[in-house]
Amino acid sequence: MRVVLGFIKACHPLPTIAVSLVISAFGWSLGWTGLPLLAVFITILVGQLSVGWSNDAHDANLDARIGRITKPTVAQEVSARALWIAAFTALLAAIVLSLAIAGWLGGSFHIFAILMAWLYNIRLSRTALSWLPYALAFGVMPAFLSFGLNDEPPTLWSVAVFAIIGVSAHLANAIPDAETDAAAGVGGLVIYLGTRRSVILCWLLLALGSGILVVVSFATNLWLALLVSVTFVLAEVLGSRLRHPKAMFYALIAVVVIDVAALVIVTAIN
């Protein structure tokens, strides 16, 4: 049981489930239903498991060196070797599943996304290019689902919004740990920019993503356009003025969640 819990913790369960649900919800809005939609969810989940396990396996030595006792490899709940084996097994399974449910063209985009996430884990997570795999991996998700469903290309605006959401989520997730990461010698775009400039960049990206959603939804659903606009302004004001140390983080995440929901709704309406 201890080993099973170690594998669960090492897969980064919350982000893994969140990403799988978000992309599956977008797939539903495009027209995926029933068993094919379930297959999409399982495929994405398996891919995310490979990403989470490879991340903890690769960082095992660093986590041990800086004493991250909450990490399962440091707590000796599971070994780095076992995580590598599980990660490669999940990667191979995700490749097969991607091609099976979305064909060679659609499936190749999901495989590319998974490989970008692995590239982040192994090489780019501690560099100023840490944002790039997020932009590319999230940006190709509409192509995976659209080509896989009916061999049609995705809308350009959905590609742009997905890429923006990916980079914004990366920044918002890294900002709260910027000081501890810097002290541990861990790099990344947030470390290179500093917390203040990273927050500004994240808000600018979310403003762009929200703006695209407002423009796209304005013609078909005025209330949705207003909701996205008001939520963005309210979150920015509260995040800037509240004194809670994580107020800005929660505000940024709130906008990301609203943008994701709006993306699904706009796609379903259109």
Model-inferred region functions:
Residues 60-106, 110, 186-219:
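Multi-pass membrane catalytic core of lipid/isoprenoid biosynthesis enzymes
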Residues 19-26, 132-149, 191-195, 250-267:
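Small-residue-rich segments of transmembrane alpha-helices in multi-pass membrane proteins
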Residues 2-9, 72-154, 235-242:
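Intramembrane alpha-helical segments
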Residues 2-5, 197, 215, 221-270:
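Extended hydrophobic alpha-helices typical of membrane-associated regions
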Residues 17-58, 95, 107-118, 152-172:
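Membrane-embedded alpha-helical segments that form the functional core of polytopic membrane enzymes
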Residues 29-36, 134-182, 196-200, 205-208:
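Functional transmembrane core segments of multi-pass inner-membrane proteins
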Residues 43-74, 165-189, 195:
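Acidic (Asp/Glu-rich) catalytic motifs at the cytosolic membrane interface
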Residues 34-41, 103-110, 127-132, 152-158, ...:
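Short, aromatic-rich membrane-interface segments at the entry and exit
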